């Protein structure tokens, strides 16, 4: 727990009750290395996604709009990752000033909410395209997708405002270091509880339930279609993809959400054990690496589910320029089959039909 002491030169001076918590040599070596790997891999992968979707595929589908925005949100976060790598390598000494502390912290929070919201919308879009392909045609338009993305960016920015406002540079007197951190006044318990619960519920629980429900309904619909076609290998492939999407999201974010909640309890003074605080402070950067590495891999992962995305990706690697006119659409293995009403208009008689393009 950190206690307030005084304010000098515009920087609040505080005391740290557990000054050694989370400060281990292997953390100062391992975490910057992982941050560097995430930065290189994420910058490369997400940049290629932006180039392929915008210049090669011409941004013609709803799914491509969500994927493009997902990649852009990741790139915004990745640009601040070198700051966190330096910060950790310098044993949690922040040399970049208060403004960059706020910007970098806000970027992390913004990416969390924007990415999760976009993945949720992408799962809803897949649900509508596969389970209700005819009914959703008029609703799944490019205009609706673009407006939805604007709303998501605004909501993510709004959810990140408390982080930007309350994350500051502090000087810890008993360790003689300057940190970029949250600091809650002991008499104000509303703020940390609100931030923690918002991150847990709005940034994970609700989106996960929507994603789980969407892909469960998608699986049931495709399962019926494959049973009619007696295509068991294809059914198994789709099941593995859906299972991977849901499990990757869950296990990537659950550790970070758990330790975020524990960190709030520490800041509130409800946990006053330095051993527990050491565990939390040590685990937190590891869970951050896990969560945001998965985040930065999401756009390439979802993109490579489409055959045409892979085709244009290979063209890009071979330095083949995009054509002036393209009629390509982003496709995914999960949208290979959908239910369409039979020609006789009997809604109770349905047959599986190919639906390879995400519209």
UniProtKB/Swiss-Prot annotation:
Source organism:
Ovis aries (Sheep)
Please give the Gene Ontology molecular function terms for this protein.
angiotensin type I receptor activity; angiotensin type II receptor activity; C-C chemokine binding; C-C chemokine receptor activity
Q: How does it sit in the membrane?
A: Multi-pass membrane protein
PROSITE patterns to which the protein is assigned, alphabetical = G_PROTEIN_RECEP_F1_1, G_PROTEIN_RECEP_F1_2
Which segments does the topology annotation call Extracellular?
A: 1-25, 90-98, 166-190, 269-278
Q: Polar residues compositional bias: what residue ranges?
A: 335-350
Q: Enumerate the Cytoplasmic topological stretches.
A: 56-61, 126-141, 217-239, 305-359
Classify the main location: membrane
**Residues with lipid group (S-palmitoyl cysteine):** 355
Q: Indicate the quaternary assembly.
A: Interacts with MAS1. Interacts with ARRB1. Interacts with FLNA (via filamin repeat 21); increases PKA-mediated phosphorylation of FLNA.
Disulfide bond entries: 18-274, 101-180
One Gene Ontology term from the biological process aspect of the record: regulation of vasoconstriction
What positions does the record give for glycosylation? 4, 176, 188
TM annotation in the entry: 26-55, 62-89, 99-125, 142-165, 191-216, 240-268, 279-304
Q: Which SMART domains match?
A: 7TM_GPCR_Srsx
Q: What does this protein do?
A: Receptor for angiotensin II, a vasoconstricting peptide, which acts as a key regulator of blood pressure and sodium retention by the kidney. The activated receptor in turn couples to G-alpha proteins G(q) (GNAQ, GNA11, GNA14 or GNA15) and thus activates phospholipase C and increases the cytosolic Ca(2+) concentrations, which in turn triggers cellular responses such as stimulation of protein kinase C.
**Post-translational changes noted in the entry:** C-terminal Ser or Thr residues may be phosphorylated.
Superkingdom, natural source: Eukaryota
Which protein is depicted? Type-1 angiotensin II receptor
GO cellular component terms, alphabetically, are: external side of plasma membrane
Q: Which Pfam family is one of those matched by this entry?
A: 7tm_1
């Amino acid at each position: 727990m950190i206690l307030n002491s005084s304010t000098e030169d515009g920087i609040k001076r505080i005391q740290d009750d557990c000054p050694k918590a989370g400060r281990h040599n292997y953390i100062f070596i391992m975490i910057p290395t992982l941050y560097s790997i995430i930065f290189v891999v994420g910058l490369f992968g997400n940049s290629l996604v932006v180039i392929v979707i915008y210049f090669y595929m011409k941004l013609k589908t709803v799914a491509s709009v969500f994927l493009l925005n997902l990649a852009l949100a990741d790139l915004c976060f990745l640009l601040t990752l070198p700051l966190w790598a330096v910060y950790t390598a310098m044993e949690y000494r922040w040399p970049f000033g208060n403004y960059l502390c706020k910007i970098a912290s806000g970027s992390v929070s913004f990416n969390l909410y924007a990415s999760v919201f976009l993945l949720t919308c992408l799962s809803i879009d897949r649900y509508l395209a596969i389970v209700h392909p005819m009914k959703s045609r008029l609703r799944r338009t490019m205009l609706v997708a673009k407006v939805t993305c604007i709303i998501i960016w605004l909501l993510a920015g709004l959810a990140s405002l408390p982080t930007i406002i309350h994350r500051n540079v502090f000087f810890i007197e008993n360790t003689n270091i300057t940190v970029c951190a949250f600091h809650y006044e002991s008499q104000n318990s509303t703020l940390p509880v609100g931030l923690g619960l918002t991150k847990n519920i709005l940034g994970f629980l609700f989106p996960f339930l929507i994603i789980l429900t969407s892909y469960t309904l998608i699986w049931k619909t495709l399962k019926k279609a494959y049973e009619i076609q007696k295509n068991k290998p294809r059914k198994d492939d789709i099941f593995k993809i859906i299972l991977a999407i849901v499990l990757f999201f869950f296990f990537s974010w659950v550790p970070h959400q758990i330790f975020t909640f524990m960190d709030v309890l520490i800041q509130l003074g409800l946990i006053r054990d330095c051993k527990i605080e050491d565990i939390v402070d040590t685990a937190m950067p590891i869970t951050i690496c896990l969560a945001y590495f998965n985040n930065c891999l999401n756009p390439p992962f979802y993109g490579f589910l489409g055959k045409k995305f892979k085709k244009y990706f290979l063209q890009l690697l071979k330095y083949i320029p995009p054509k002036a006119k393209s009629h390509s659409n982003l496709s995914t293995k999960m949208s290979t089959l959908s239910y369409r009403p039979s020609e006789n208009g009997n809604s109770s008689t349905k047959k599986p039909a190919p639906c390879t393009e995400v519209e």
